[in-house]
Curated annotation (Swiss-Prot):
Organism: Homo sapiens (Human)
Region of interest (Disordered), residue spans: 23-58
Cellular-component GO terms for this entry: nucleolus; nucleoplasm
Ion transport recorded as keyword: no
InterPro entries recorded: FAM32A
Any one of the GO BP annotations: apoptotic process
Membrane spanning residue stretches: none
Lineage top rank: taxon: Eukaryota
Basic and acidic residues bias locations: 45-58
Keyword rRNA-binding included in the entry's annotation: no
Keywords for this protein: Apoptosis, Cell cycle, Nucleus
Protein name as annotated: Protein FAM32A
Similarity annotation: Belongs to the FAM32 family.
Length: 112
């Protein structure tokens, strides 16, 4: 029984952990001033705009390409918005009249 007389009987103690012990958590401050938040939001928006200008790492060709894409997209939108649904249906029916019977499908009606 002499071999078991030196046995640790309590919980194990790890080096360095006993020094830390249980610490209380710090409470978060909930009473932040709304004016400070609004001011911070305003400055953050300005900072984002400045960063966009400063961090534009596109080549001039890339910038021109994207600008032209936006321009073409706007042209497509305006072109589609210029006609009413009735006009589109009439144009489609005219197109169907010019096709041969191989592509024959019934005419589309805009009223039912």
């Amino acid at each position: 029984m002499e071999a078991y007389e030196q046995v640790q009987k309590g919980p194990l103690k790890l080096k360095g952990v006993a020094e830390l012990g249980v610490t209380k958590r710090k409470k978060k401050k909930k009473d932040k001033d709304k004016a400070k938040l609004l001011e911070a939001m305003g400055t953050s928006k300005k900072n984002e705009e400045e960063k966009r200008r400063g961090l534009d790492k596109r080549t001039p060709a890339q910038a021109a390409f994207e600008k032209m894409q936006e321009k073409r997209q706007m042209e497509r939108i305006l072109k589609k918005a210029s006609k009413t649904h009735k006009q589109r249906v009439e144009d489609f029916n005219r197109h169907l009249d010019t096709l041969t019977e191989h592509y024959d499908i019934p005419k589309v009606s805009w009223t039912k």
